[in-house]
């Protein structure tokens, strides 16, 4: 669980990086990134930066209730499976959500076990078909039976995009978009009902259209970031 963090003004002199990053492994599952405020990221190079970067077929993670402001491609799923992007605010980002199908050309199931793109070999080193892996992550245990190269099982639900350049960046996904679950997203809302967007106060007014989304859960923005306690000098 990675929650209630404020990450800002990072990646000012680099590219192909995220405020949060993980990648190239089917087994790094179960991470929950919740209630983080990610903003004002750098944007160098052709690839740029990502808010939360699930790179190279990373799978089985949950991105819930985060606020992205000027955070490149905010929620980035690079060919992975069974990821959840839910209840997030994406504001003035290059793209609210990114999806691609890189696994169809990059995963090498018959390569040497030491090859970083042999994702099956990485899973086999952990006996992924046996408990505790198989009981905790049953979709991982059955991955080889369900078109393992494809970006299946991803859910993009109840997200809000405001003044983003694009709602969706979907490189090479023409054949697979209908296998992604999209539901109850506000893809380009005119007025989300922020208290004061000009001052980056992204709390929602009581009359906000966002609050009418089925199942919308309040994001505790006021709790995000540093706080004073007995261990903090200043």
Q: Each predicted region: which residue ranges?
A:
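Short Cys/His-rich Zn2+-coordinating modules
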Residues: 17-18, 69-70, 137-142
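Acidic, glycine- and Ser/Thr-rich low-complexity intrinsically disordered tracts
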Residues: 93, 98-234
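Short, contiguous acidic/charged loop-to-helix segments that flank catalytic cores in large enzymes
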Residues: 23-25, 53-55, 73-77, 143-150
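Right-handed parallel beta-helix
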Residues: 1-12, 24-46, 51-55, 59-72, 81-95, ...
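Short glycine/acidic-rich loop motifs that flank beta-strands on beta-rich extracellular proteins
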Residues: 6-7, 11-18, 42-50, 71-80, ...
